[in-house]
Structures are given as C-alpha cells and as structure tokens.
Amino acid sequence: ELRLVDIAGIVKGASQGEGMGNAFLSHIRQVDAIAQVVRCFEKAVGGEEITHVDGSVDPIRDIQTIQSELLLADLQTIESALPKAERAAKSRDPDAVARAQVLTAIKPLLEDEKPVRSALEEGVIQDPAQLRQLKGLGFITAKPILFVANVDESDVTGEGELFQRV
C-alpha cells in the first residue's frame, strides 16, 4: 500500500525554526521516503503569475535549499545525541556503543554536506547492530528521495529548460 502525505513546503532557515520549522521536520521524520516536488514552470495555466517564495523560479536552488535544511536538521540531531551516546557507551552496553559509533561515523558526512543515506551507499555503516541504531535515530537524509518536476501543461514531455535542469 502506498500512502502519500502532503507536507507543507520548507523554507530556508527551517532548521532554525523559520516557517513551519520544527513542525515540518517532525512531520517529515515520520515518513518512509520523500518525494520532493520542484516547481519547473514560470506561470500558471492562462499566464497567471504565481509568486515564488524566493522571488524567482530556480528548481536547482530549491532542491539545494531543502536538502541543506534537511542536512542541518540531521546535524543538529547528532550534536544533541552524540554526547549522551558517548556517556552511555562508557557502560559498554552494546547498543549504546553501536549508537555512539553510528553518530561518530555519520557526523563528518553531514559536515561535508552528504546525506546519511550515503553512509549506507558507501558502506560506512555495515554492522547489523549499527544499522539497527541508525534506523532508530530517525535521520531525515537517510530516507530515499525522489524529485518530482511540477511542469506546466506545455511541458508534459519534459523538454523545457527548467525541467532539464532538474
């Protein structure tokens, strides 16, 4: 069963509470995958102007803005969770140790602006205990993402410049 949930758009600064901020981030943490709809049209059907939140239509900028906010949110999760995980790992509890290892391994990736899913793709995290901990941490950028180009009726074939940029 596929269930789609429309979550209101994110704006620059969401990781610091701008726009829907934390509410947006808490909603997106609960989904299994992300379909990011990207505006790839200048005007609405009939030529009506639709103001873009950033003043101009630039799908690549929009993708980068959202991805940056999601990376920052995950980095904040690590900065909050890592000190606690390191303290808990001192007890030598295997789950606590695995959690600290996962957070330590993922932090540099996020600092290099790579999503958490790249840790899986690049084999940075392979240990089953670490994979379980990773799943439980709820990182947004660990989720698969699909970019969906929102085009106007004249560009359903995807030949327009804005679509091609995506």
Regions found by a protein language model. Name each.
Residues E1-A33, F41-Q67, E122-L137, L162-F163:
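Switch II of P-loop NTPase G domains
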Residues E1-G19, H27, Q67-L71, L75-Q76, ...:
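Conserved ASCE/P-loop NTPase catalytic core
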Residues R3, V31-R39, P59-A85, V102-S118, ...:
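Conserved beta-strand/loop subsegment of P-loop NTPase cores
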Residues V37, G47-E48, S91, V116:
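A generic "cationic amphipathic patch" detector
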Residues H52-V53, D74, V156:
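A short, ordered amphipathic alpha-helix with a cationic face
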Residues K84-V166:
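C-terminal-of-GTPase-core extension/linker across diverse P-loop GTPases
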